[in-house]
Every structure is written in C-alpha cells, then in structure tokens.
From Swiss-Prot:
The keyword Ribosomal protein applies. GO terms for biological process: translation. InterPro entries: Ribosomal_uS2 (IPR001865), Ribosomal_uS2_bac/mit/plastid (IPR005706), Ribosomal_uS2_CS (IPR018130), Ribosomal_uS2_flav_dom_sf (IPR023591). One of its GO terms (molecular function) is structural constituent of ribosome. This is Small ribosomal subunit protein uS2. Keywords: Ribonucleoprotein, Ribosomal protein. It comes from the Bacteria. The keyword Ligase does not apply.
Length: 255
C-alpha cells in the first residue's frame, strides 16, 4: 500500500480550480487565488497539489497510529459521498446535520447512541408487548437517531482528525474541533477562511466531481494507514478476513 496518487489533470477535470464569483470571496484566500475568469475566481492548483498531498499524509499517519478520522459533509451533494467514503475506509461520518455539542458534549451524544443500540435490540427482536402504534413510534425514533448518529455510533469517543467539506456550512463542527484540539483537514473554497483550518486544501467545495475526488483520496489515504498499522503490528493484511477494498481513483473522477 502507498498514499494515493493524483494528477493536476484529474483536479482540472473535476473542476477543483473553480472558485466562487469574485464578489463573494474571502480576502484571506488571496494567496491561493491564481486569477479570475468571467468574474469567477480561479484557484491556484500549483498550491492545491502539495497541500492535498500533505493532508493525505496526515490522514494516513493518523490512522496508522490507531487514530480515528471523522468525515463531515452535510450539504446535499456531499452527503452520500461522505458516508460511502468513510464506510469504505472503516472511518466515521456525519452527513445529515451537525448537532451542537456533538464533540464537546460527547457524554450526552453517547447516551443517545446507547438509546439507538437499545432500539435496535428491541426492534430486531420480536418486539413483543408493543402495540402497532408503539412499535411505529419506536421505529421513527430509531430512524431519527440513526440519521443523526449512525455514522459515529461505533466511534467510541471523539476523533483524532476531522475531514470537512464546506467550512462555512460546518463552522460549528470546526469550532468544536478547535475547542477540543482536534486537528482539521478541510477543503477551502474562495469564500472560506483558511486561518481556521490546520491542513487546508484550496479547491472547489460545491462540484460533485470535485467532492467525490477529495473523498476518494482521503478514503484511500485512510486505507493506507490501516495497512501500515497492520503491517507494523505484524498482521498479514492479505490473510485478514476483511481486506479493505481500494476502488479505482478514476471512478471518483467520473462520478
């Protein structure tokens, strides 16, 4: 295993270089702007490439030492990709809505996760003694909890690293990470504040193909970390009952 490769051409084909309209920019992004075209800022991919490479190394290193990575992306075009990428790399995700206190009030969140597990036990069993209406209410409660917490139910504590799509939309998540000292890898579009992020990656945070490419690369970096961890512990990855699947990067670029 090795860190995933990517090329400038893949970034271009995914539209990573397209920022927002020039009047919407955050002036702090000036160092990462190449120029503008038709009143759209163009992000300097010559900087994106090394910054993305550094972020991938951080993800791999975090997982290699047994750390947990939390993928966060609740916007419509990121939601499904975030969940799939986290699951594929045995990591965790929030893709519905960030609940205030999700990290800073972990004890309360843990209680809700316990409730979700209890509901699973009840509803996966015979659920005897419940009326049809009571069962329906329990199913609705489970569905609501699973939507909010399903991606972190097995995390077992706060993560060691967070990967975020759209820092403006996920500002509460970033604030909580800062309070707890959790480092953040994030995509920073032309309207974002790079100062908030430990490992910023300049790029478009709206285009589905760009989001798919970022998530695929981060996921594969995490898989690389898993392989490194198992190698250092003397485990033979090929002999494992569950070998992480490494999908083709090109599929993400085409998605």
């Amino acid at each position: 295993m090795a860190l995933p490769d990517f090329s400038m051409r893949q970034l271009l084909e995914a539209g990573v270089h397209f920022g927002h309209q020039t009047h919407r920019w955050n002036p702090k992004m000036k160092p990462y702007i190449f120029g503008d075209r038709n009143n759209i800022h163009i992000i300097d991919l010559a900087q994106t490439v090394p910054m993305l490479s550094r972020a991938l190394q951080v993800v791999s290193d975090t997982v290699a030492r047994g750390g947990r990575v939390l993928f966060v992306g609740t916007k419509r075009q990121a939601s499904e990709i975030i969940a799939d990428s986290a699951k594929r790399s045995a990591q965790y995700y929030v893709n519905s809505r960030w609940l205030g206190g999700m990290m800073t009030n972990w004890k309360t969140i843990s209680n809700s996760i316990q409730r979700l597990r209890k509901l699973d036990e009840i509803l996966n069993g015979e659920a005897q003694g419940f009326t049809k209406k009571e069962r329906l209410n329990l199913e609705r409660e489970r569905e609501k909890l699973d939507k909010a917490l399903g991606g972190i139910r097995d995390m077992g504590g706060t993560p060691d690293l967070m990967f975020i799509i759209d820092t403006n939309k996920e500002k509460i998540a970033i604030d909580e990470a800062k309070r707890l000292g959790i480092p953040v890898v994030a995509i920073i579009d032309s309207n974002c504040d790079p100062d908030l992020i430990d490992y910023p990656i300049p790029g478009n945070d709206d285009a589905s193909r760009a989001i798919a490419l970022y998530c695929e690369l981060i996921s594969r970096a995490a898989i690389d970390g898993i392989a490194r961890q198992q190698s250092s512990s003397g485990r033979d990855l090929g002999a494992s009952s569950e070998v992480p699947v490494e999908p083709a990067l090109e599929e993400a670029a085409e998605g």
